[in-house]
Structures are given as structure tokens and as C-alpha cells.
């Protein structure tokens, strides 16, 4: 779609948003034509979500200024300024003419009402339908979004649906009144990669069918490239560049746009020095993990059932090697990692540096020094009550109790320097608390905490999924450097095929607790054999 020369559907000029006197959106301008798909792209804190919320005056305690005119189809219309019309008039626009879908449907949907009731409520409010007609229309809307058994799903509560089904229900609710503009705030971020592709295709189909405009809020450039007509790039509350998607991606003008486009992780794996017959650092044969579950009906009173989370998994990791484990939520990959760490009961054989996990604490302590873990979310894996010195040096208190306080401080500073954090950057670094650091810096703290006991193998459980794309690239680069310098081995758990391609030597693909395919990364990702692997690679938008 070419740049608009005629009147748009929505025309935003000089939009400013401030909280408590601090301005976070700085006088931005953009337009959306009827039936157009505009992507607003940027990292966390860029102001893109606040912009969308401000258009409907949903940003709580915000001071909003500027003009956001919504035009009607009639040529004589002067438009309605969403930022100045009375609240009563705006209430008639929200949900009916402009609808919004949110990032996390589990929190956006009301847990106390069925999905059908929540969709029907919109139709009763805006369309004046009777309760019976609204319920029937809700079932049809769910069917239109591709939910199986829509009548049964309409009677379900949000927690009884999968993540993808909840997002489809949210889309059904948003489209109930056939809005002219849909604000989609990170609509696929909380979903698995294959479900993400399905929701994206669904949105595109519904957009074409209803002829509505879409403002897509996202940090995912692959999503923008595949879905949008035009893109506006936000940084620190400013739109730094906008234009047609093909033009911006092929010839970006602003340095920040170029940085975003270049932020995809690059493959830079260290050569594995060990020979084929070298003893692996981690080896599993017939690994099996199961949980007791309640059986339905009267049988559940007398006997528990069994849920198999990991079944007959075989794998090995050589010194200096990275094994990637990729799969969707519920595939068993994190359970496999917990079993490898000796934190779950398991069946089969599992050896760390040639030894199995023992019952007595002393034997396990030696293995825990060999094997450390870095968790997914640095915001929750670091105690907010502990200083950097306490967090990073904690392992030394257990594994090297003979060290003095000063020696522990020196080791902590050395580990922090290894991950790119120094007192030159952060005065009184050891006395600081986690909240004083960004997400990427917190993940560096978590890596330093793992490295301080000089392990041979790190279990990386989704180490970059909570980070922005540019920070993700930096953290992956750090892990690649540490592997080259220290000869570390990694067990890398992720749902991100791009991260596997950048980091791993070998990969195993898991679904429903079973390993469906395994082998060298180049072979598995470039020439997958199993249909599920093909689906996973295609959904990752790497083609």
C-alpha cells in the first residue's frame, strides 16, 4: 500500500503521554488508512503499548495531549478527536468501532465468567442483542476463529482453554461488533511458535474478510515483515522512522532501525575439541519422568493415574558442546532439564561427569559444582532482598566455605567482569540490588552467579526469552564467548528455533514428552525429517 495522500481512518498528531510529570511519548504523528495494517515496533519501554492505550484513554493516571481523529466513511465528516470527546461518547466507540486485543489473554479475560458470556456481553452492550441471540452469536464468532467444538468452548472458563484458544476467544470478543480498527498489542508473544503462526494467519484472514484496519504493537520484526503494510519504529517515546515495510527493511534510514534489523542472533559456535570417544559430561539413557495424577470418576478414589512427562529420552553432551532442546510448552523440555539437574525423581540412567545423582547430600554437592543453571526470567530468579555480592557469591559459601569474605568479594568481581559488568560502569557494584539493573544486566548477574563456582556445564532454561531482541543478541554473544574461553558445555532449553540455530551443535526436538528427532543442528533445521520438526521450523518464520 502506498503512502496515504487522502484522508485516513485515524490521524494522530502530536500525541504526548506523561505519568507523574515524566513524559514517555513525545509528540508522535502517524496515520492509518481504512483496511491498512500498520505495525508499531520497538523494544520494551519504547512507548508503543502506552500509545495504543492512550488512543482509547485507557492509560491509567496518564496526562494525554495531542489530537487523534477518527474519521467516518462520509466525505463530509470532520472526524472525532478521541482525546477530547466526552467519556460517554468514547465509551460507544470502544469495542464497537475500535477494539483491542491484549498480550496475555489469561489476565485480560475475566476468570469468573465463561468465554461465551464475555463475548455475549459485548454484543448486548453495543448491538442491543437479547441474551439468547448474543449467546448464539458468541458461538458463531468462536467458530469463525477456528476454535474446535465452539458450543462447548463457549461454556468453558478461561483457565479451561489453552493459550492459543484463549487468544482466539479474545479475538472473537474484539471482532464481535465488526470494528473498523483493531489495536493488537503483542497478540502472539505469549504463545508457542506454531500457535503464533496460526493466530497471525487468523488475524490476516479476518482482517481481509472484514476490511478492518489493524495497528499491530510488537517487538518481533519477523511478524512485521510477514503481516504489515507499513511500519513505524519507536525508540524512547519517539517515532524515529516510518514507511512501507519493504522500504524500511531493505533501506533503513535511522541507526536504531538498522540496529533492530541486525539484532537476529548469529551462529558462532565453538569447535568441539573432544573426540567421539571422550567421556560425555552429561549422558542419559532411557530417561523417564512421570507424575501421579487424579483419575476421573470413582476410580480416582482408590488409585492414582500416571502422567508421563518425559519418556525414554537418550542424549549426551560432550565437553565444550551445546545440546539444544526445542519444543513447545508442555513438550517436557524443562522437565528434562530439572531431571538432569537431579531436582526430580526419574527412571532410567543419568550420569553427570560419569557419576549418577546420589541420595546423600555430600556426593550431590560435588556434582552441583560441575553443573549450574541459569533460569528464564532474571526478574524472578534473583532475590530482590540480596545485594549483588550476596547473589553472585552465594555458591562460594556452599562450595568453597574456606574462602574469606575478601576472597569471595574478589571472586565475585572477577565473575562479574567475565560477564561484562564492572565497578567502572556501576560504582559500588557489589552493594547494589537487582532492581537497579536492566533485564539484560540482570541476566548477566545470573550467569555470573552460575560461573563463580567454575562449572563445566550450564543448564540454560530459556535464557533470553524474557529479553528484547537487541539484548538477546548481546546475551547470546556473551554465552558464545564464555564457551570459547572456558570450554563450557551447555544444555540449552528453548522454544526459539533461531536461538538453537545460533548456539547449538546438536539438537533434540521434543513433543508430548518424546524426542521426535535429533542430530546436528544443520541437518535437523535445514533438512528436517519429522513432520512436527518441519512445522516448527516453518512456524519460526526462518524461511
Region spans (language model):
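ABC ATPase "signature
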Residues: 239-243, 251, 518-519, 527
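A short, surface-exposed alpha-helical micro-motif characterized by mixed small hydrophobic
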Residues: 224-226, 500-502
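A short, proline-enriched helix->beta-strand linker immediately N-terminal to the Walker B motif
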Residues: 176-180, 452-456
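Conserved ABC ATPase "signature" region
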Residues: 133-152, 407-428, 538
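Conserved ABC ATPase signature
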Residues: 156-161, 165, 428, 432-437, ...
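ABC ATPase NBD Q-loop/coupling interface
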Residues: 69-92, 130, 201, 301-302, ...
